[in-house]
Amino acid sequence: MTHAQANTTALAPWLELNLQQFPLEYADQLSSHLPMALHALHSLGADEARMAAFFKSYSRRFDGVPAPAAEPAARDWLGVRGDWSAYSALRSYFELALAAEGRDARLRRVLPDLLPGISAVAFHGAIRLAHAVQGGHAGELVAALAYWASRWQRLPAPPQNGAACLSLTAWSERLVAGAATWRSEAPNIFLRMLEASGRPLYAELAWVAPAPAPTLLARVAELASLALGYYLHSANFTVLHMITGLRAVRVLAPWLPQDKTFQIQAQEVLTQAFVAAYMAGRVQWREIPLTAAVATWAVLADAATLSEDDHAIKLVHACRDESAAYGDPRYLQAAAMALR
């Protein structure tokens, strides 16, 4: 039995304390990774002392910034979707809705309207929600839903040009080659994604993407494999978010509609976000020597729990999760790279 299985209640107090004390963002619209990293640390086996130390260390980023105050519930969440100032009203709304409907019914109701905004704050709306679902804390689930809804951002759909579909390999090669000649200087990932969505390469690749896969999960698996390969050849910070973002979609997929129309539309949205994120990454493609033999997951998990790097912690957790889902041994290499 793992540490996480043996002590399933150890995470809740830390998530609750975070909600009571800290905001959702800090500095220049940077998403707080504290609740996500806490869940990852717990899942990787961090003990109580390590959880406390990481919480104290990370909390310094919020110096002087209070947690959001409570507000009356929004009457129509879709009417204020994408309005950051409505976060507290959305949080009150989702708190009442979850109490009335339960988790599964509420997720099935709202996720179809949230997914088109998957690019929100560089996938962090979806990423935080996936961690919240797995963490099992009702308050964090409410906060994650409200965060995604208030920061909801949909990339523009490019005009259809009737181009033929490329194979997955050819499409990926065109993305890598085309993105190498474009660079944005916007400070945040999501701003660079927005800028990328106005470029001809985005329009081209969004419409010559491979034909729809049989299911959304099948397309997620294909894109996850590509993102993993990109990371192994770049160790790129934005590609890291593509890996954790795709993991989030896989975790949330059971609550998404299964009808063919939605599944195809969801693949289009995800493909557009994938293109924009890779372009936003300013990826420097290079041959990074891979270790012939790397440590086991147990060793990497232990190392991650001692890290102060919230992104490394989350990536090791995500890679272990994705390795279990897909059986791809390259995830072990990626996790080891994140801890170097």
Predicted regions and their residues:
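Mature, well-folded catalytic/scaffold domains that follow N-terminal targeting or propeptide regions
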Residues: 1-340
